Curated annotation (Swiss-Prot):
Coiled coil: none annotated. CDD domains: Tiki. The gene is TRABD2B. Keywords: Cell membrane, Glycoprotein, Hydrolase, Membrane, Metal-binding, Metalloprotease, Protease, Signal, Transmembrane, Transmembrane helix, Wnt signaling pathway. This is Metalloprotease TIKI2. Pfam families: TraB_PrgY_gumN. Belongs to the TIKI family. Glycans are attached at residues 228, 335. One of its GO terms (cellular component) is plasma membrane. It comes from Homo sapiens (Human). The keyword Repressor does not apply. Its cofactor is Mn(2+); Co(2+). One of its GO terms (biological process) is proteolysis. Was named TIKI in reference to large-headed humanoid in Polynesian mythology. Residues 354-409, 422-441, 450-492 are annotated as: Disordered.
Length: 517
């Protein structure tokens, strides 16, 4: 995912005793008067041909698609190379994400967590499973979803997961978030579209690079603190004594309406605990600050620098190609961003307002245009296949945003969708192309055939795959050295978690019905 996320867990851990008011109208925004009134998360790298940076958000694409300016969609269509944080259509990505969540050596959470904490967690998950049928919407049921399947898709095999992933899972098992299940998140949708359009796709990060900071680095007390605080918050919400401060609806509104200075972007949806209304004693505030500092460095600054360098490498490898980089919007906002890295290296990167024409020379090997979608650029105008976007408040993302703005890692919903959609593809046809984990000299690969299911309002919707693999990392040494059966690693950052059903859930009609078949 991060899902995704410069200060998510970070600022979240430090947020104490302060209930923040919720925006009144969720994801609703006023219709704009014209394209120029839309918010834009598109940046252009000035070169010949140009390259583009696009800020995504890890929420159902149908909630934001109509608010994405036509020139952003045109830039995507004009590109011949599309890169994401992770390769969302590669079976190895899915299997590695699934396995990195597992405790090593067949360990179980009951063996690792303190007795009381384990049973509190189990009681909460039992409650969620009981409530799941009432949380689901008629539309979800009409699309073939059922409660047990949905619960297993998110929380299956939870007792085998590392505490950090369980913490993220708990934060995705809320009524509001459950109601969003069934539609691919924007990142995944773009990956599916790129595959459908036969574009060359790839990634700038390896699965291990997203997993490692979560599975390693925190000591036993920090792990206990983060998981315990997460459960306390969810138990308070459940008891009615606390209202969730920021929800997916709020994040969608801020993305669509361009309120980028809002602190909500520090919390990339409710996947990350805020610990609001929790009075932390001084020693626990120190623990929170230590966790904040660690993840700020590992999940924000180091990732941005690494991603920026790999963007530059890909640009050098594809000097005559139009490249499109789709990362979490937070990677382009705040301090020490990917854009800062590129500018420091001498590249000219400009924000591209909505309504501004995209000037791109026609690609030498244009990708096939799916269902009448135009891929020819050269002043590229809004693509015919892209619906007229309803509106939103005009706001260009400022370059000097709050340093706590969070780059998105893949969130729990994002990853569970990857697995579910992948299980509906005959990915074994491509298995032979993934005999070895791809190294980073293979920064882009050709995506092959895919099946599609066209959703009503939008152009196309391809699919992706999944599989299983051995855990790439061992449990943090600090945790293994603990006397009591302590929890495995638990940070509270913004990485998403892949449901454990990688090896337990059978093929079923899609969890997310608008997704590919």
């Amino acid at each position: 995912m991060h899902a995704a996320l410069a200060g998510p867990l970070l600022a979240a851990l430090l947020a104490t005793a302060r209930a923040r008011p919720q925006p009144p109208d969720g994801g609703q925004c006023r219709p704009p008067g014209s394209q120029r009134d839309l918010n834009s998360f598109l940046w252009t790298i000035r070169r010949d041909p140009p390259a583009y940076l696009f800020g995504t958000i890890h929420v159902p694409y149908t909630r934001v698609w109509d608010f994405i300016p036509d020139n952003s969609k045109a830039a995507f269509q004009a590109s011949t190379r599309v890169y994401f944080e992770l390769d969302l259509t590669d079976p190895y990505t899915i299997s590695a994400l699934a396995s990195c969540q597992l405790l090593p050596h067949g360990e179980n959470l009951q063996d690792v967590l303190p007795h009381e904490l384990y049973w509190r967690l189990k009681r909460h998950l039992d409650y969620v499973k009981l409530m799941m049928p009432s949380w689901m919407t008629p539309a979800q049921r009409g699309k073939g979803l059922y409660a047990d399947y949905l619960f297993n898709a998110i929380a299956g095999n939870w007792e085998r997961k590392r505490p950090v992933w369980v913490m993220l899972m708990v934060n995705s098992l809320t009524e509001r978030d459950v109601r969003f299940r069934g539609v691919p998140v924007l990142d995944l949708y773009l990956a599916q579209q790129a595959e459908k359009m036969k574009k060359t796709t790839g990634a700038v990060e390896q699965v291990e690079e997203q997993c490692h900071p979560l599975n390693n680095g925190l000591n036993f007390s920090q792990v206990l603190f983060a998981l315990n605080q997460t459960l306390l918050q969810q138990e308070s919400v459940r008891a009615g004594s606390l209202q969730a401060s920021y929800t997916t609806e709020d994040l969608i509104k801020h993305y669509n309406c361009g309120d980028l200075s809002a602190v909500i972007f520090n919390h990339d949806t409710s996947q990350l605990p805020n610990f609001i209304n929790t009075t932390l004693p001084p020693h626990e505030q120190v623990t929170a600050q230590e966790i904040d500092s660690y993840f700020r460095q590992e999940l924000i600054y180091k990732r941005n620098e690494r991603m920026g360098k790999r963007v530059m490498a890909l640009l050098r490898e594809n000097e005559d190609k139009i490249c499109f980089f789709a990362f979490g919007a937070g990677h382009f906002l705040g301090n020490n961003t990917v854009i800062d890295i590129l500018r420091q290296a001498g590249l000219e990167v400009d924000h591209t307002p909505a309504g501004q024409a995209i000037h791109s020379p026609a690609p030498q090997s244009p990708a096939p245009s799916p269902e009448g979608t135009s891929t020819s650029p050269a002043p590229v105008t809004p693509a015919a296949a892209v619906p007229e976007a309803p509106s939103v408040t005009p706001t260009a993302p400022p370059e000097d945003e709050d340093p706590a703005l969070s780059p998105h890692l893949l969130l729990p919903d994002s990853l569970s969708q990857l697995e579910e959609f992948g299980r509906q593809r005959k990915w074994h046809k491509r298995q032979s192309t993934h005999q070895r984990p791809r190294q980073f000299n293979d920064l882009w690969v050709r995506i092959e055939d895919s099946t599609t299911a066209s959703p009503p309002p939008l152009p196309l919707q391809p699919t992706h795959s999944s599989g299983t693999a051995k855990p790439p990392f061992q449990l943090s040494d600090q945790l293994q050295q603990q006397d009591p059966p302590g929890p495995a690693s638990s940070s509270a950052p913004t990485l998403g978690l892949l449901p454990a059903i990688a090896t337990t859930i059978a093929v079923c009609f899609l969890l997310h019905s608008l997704g590919p078949s």
